[in-house]
């Protein structure tokens, strides 16, 4: 029987996790907004990578290799800052996904005709869309279907993500590079000056800072797939590898795609909705195939599918894992036969659907959308402040805990990387709260703008606090959950604190009762094991997964 259960263990490859990471962060459709800034966009992307993307990847890699049990961000923040903040991170992530997709959904309706060979009709429709509610309903049905697919298990949506990114981002990017070279070789003049001076951003006070913040935010999400770390055969080695490959691929998709768009389309002709399709048409025309844009548009849909299934699964998967430890009512904890929290996932897509219809049907809703978008930004970046803070604190609280990957430079390196991440996150939070120039027409006044955002943030954090307090007064623990206790619980502490133990978390969590139940095998805070034991622990057996 044991062998049979082991054979059912579902694993995903490094390639699959890498593509899942890339689908969360990068896509050619995201490049259009930055193409307004020409070659200077390279500088913005480089600054964003140095100040936020790389620190996030480095920190997530260390945390995942030191604390590779189920839970992702919940595990890491819980080890460093406690259960309350850990639950807050998961709920922020879950709400962020629901709100973000709900707000973005109505914009898809205007581009529906680009899936047909009539480019001119597609442009006219994008400029003056009709039957938007009906078309949006079609997209929402597609999203519900993709959520249904995501409930079929990690292996199913991992394959969707893998092939979706390859077909929908990497192959179109290669085609763009080749055809852009042909386009230039045919004697076409680039729409931007190609010189080192073009790399220097034009200073426009708050406008320049806001753009930088937008680039930082475009890099968020690479850590989300830590939810699936136990589906890797050797998570301590494979997770960092997937993270670093993801960083390189995402950066290349951002930079190369953005520069090609800026070269092909003059700044004044760039349209957020359909400029990417225009680029595909222009490039296709260089080889006598203007209809090529339609092929690439359908390919981009594959990337959208990858993004949706990964987003619909990741946050709910982590929340469902933690929920069984006593943090969610039993109804939300229930998993289907594929071990997916289907009820949580359908609740999330239902909320997204409601928001999408509200955004589309309520008149003069622009101000509401702006406020909701900025609230999401503030909450999501606060999530990263907590992650970076937990990382630094764990360097002091659990200095000897083995991590197969460690941010180099000792405590100085930890403060440098974590500090840059915290400062970048706070910088973006301040810019999100800072009233934009169009605030009067969209919201009313700067005071109302700032007040509403802060109130909405407080409401979400309040919901997190109330749910955590309720969990302490209700017996929501599932005794059959597979969520390991925090190390500080195993060591007999009431909350995270300083210990000198060097026992790997894989050893400490083995054969323990699940979180929320009495500790079965306690360890002392100063327990020590040999180097040989530590090395052996880096190759977990399937039963530990």
Describe every region a protein language model picked out:
Residues 171-175, 319, 373-404, 416-431, ...:
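Hydrophobic alpha-helical segments of multi-pass membrane transport proteins
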Residues 1-4, 75-78, 105-135, 171, ...:
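Helix-loop-helix connectors at the membrane interface of multi-pass transporters/channels
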Residues 7, 42-43, 122-133, 162-297:
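Helix-loop-helix junctions that connect adjacent transmembrane segments
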Residues 134-186, 220, 243-248, 373-386, ...:
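Membrane-interface loop-to-helix entry segments
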Residues 29-132, 246-249, 451-460:
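Extracellular loop-to-transmembrane helix junctions
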Residues 75-77, 82, 114-119, 123-124, ...:
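TM-loop-TM module centered on a large, flexible mid-protein loop between adjacent transmembrane helices
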Residues 1-47, 53-60, 67-69, 470-545:
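Membrane-interface "cap" regions at the ends of multi-pass membrane proteins
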Residues 6-8, 12, 163, 331-338, ...:
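C-terminal membrane-solvent junction of multi-pass transporters and transport-like membrane proteins
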């Amino acid at each position: 029987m044991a062998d049979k259960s082991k054979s059912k263990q579902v694993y995903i490859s490094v390639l699959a996790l890498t593509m899942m990471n890339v689908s969360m962060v990068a896509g050619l459709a995201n490049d259009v907004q930055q193409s307004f800034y020409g070659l200077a966009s390279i500088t913005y992307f480089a600054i964003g990578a140095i100040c936020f993307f790389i620190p996030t990847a480095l920190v997530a890699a260390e945390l995942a290799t030191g604390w590779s049990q189920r839970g992702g961000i919940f595990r890491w923040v819980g080890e460093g800052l406690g259960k309350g903040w850990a639950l807050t991170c998961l709920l922020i992530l879950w709400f962020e996904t629901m709100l973000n997709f709900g707000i973005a959904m109505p914009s898809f309706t205007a581009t529906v005709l680009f899936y047909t060979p009539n480019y001119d009709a597609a442009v006219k429709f994008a400029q003056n869309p009709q039957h938007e509610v009906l078309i949006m309903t079609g997209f929402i049905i597609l999203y519900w279907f993709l959520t249904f697919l995501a409930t079929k298990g990690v292996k199913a949506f991992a394959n969707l993500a893998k092939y979706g990114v390859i077909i929908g981002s990497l192959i179109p990017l290669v085609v763009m590079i080749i055809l852009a070279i042909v386009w230039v070789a045919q004697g076409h003049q680039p729409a931007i000056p190609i010189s080192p001076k073009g790399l220097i951003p034009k200073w426009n006070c708050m406008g320049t800072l806001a753009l930088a913040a937008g680039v930082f935010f475009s890099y968020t999400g690479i850590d989300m797939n830590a939810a699936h770390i136990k589906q890797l055969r050797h998570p301590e080695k494979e997770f960092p590898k997937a993270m670093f490959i993801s960083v390189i691929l995402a950066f290349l998709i951002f930079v190369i795609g953005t520069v090609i768009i800026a070269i092909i389309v003059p700044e004044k002709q760039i349209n957020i909705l359909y400029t990417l399709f225009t680029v595909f048409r222009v490039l296709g025309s260089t080889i006598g195939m203007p209809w090529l844009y339609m092929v690439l548009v359908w390919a981009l849909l594959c990337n959208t599918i990858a993004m949706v299934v990964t987003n619909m699964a990741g946050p709910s998967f982590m929340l469902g894992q933690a929920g069984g430890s006593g943090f969610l009512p039993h109804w939300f904890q229930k998993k289907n036969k594929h071990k997916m929290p289907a009820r949580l996932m359908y609740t999330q897509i239902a909320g997204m659907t409601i928001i999408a219809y509200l955004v589309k049907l309520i008149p003069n809703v622009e101000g509401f959308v702006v406020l909701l978008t900025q609230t999401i930004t503030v909450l999501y970046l606060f999530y990263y402040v907590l992650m970076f803070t937990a990382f630094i604190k764990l360097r002091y609280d659990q200095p000897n805990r083995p991590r197969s990957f460690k941010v180099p430079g000792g405590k100085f390196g930890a403060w440098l990387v974590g500090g840059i991440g915290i400062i970048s996150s706070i910088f973006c939070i301040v810019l999100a709260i800072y009233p934009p120039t169009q605030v009067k027409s969209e919201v009313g006044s700067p005071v109302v703008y700032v007040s509403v955002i802060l109130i909405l943030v407080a409401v979400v954090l309040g919901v997190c606090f109330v749910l955590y307090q309720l969990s302490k007064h209700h017996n929501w623990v599932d005794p059959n959950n597979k969520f390991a206790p925090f190390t500080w619980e195993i060591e007999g502490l009431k909350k995270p604190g300083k210990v000198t133990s060097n026992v790997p978390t894989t050893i400490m969590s083995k054969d323990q009762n699940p979180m929320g139940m009495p500790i079965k095998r306690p360890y002392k805070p100063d327990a020590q094991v040999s180097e040989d034991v530590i090395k052996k622990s880096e190759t977990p057996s399937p039963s530990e997964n």
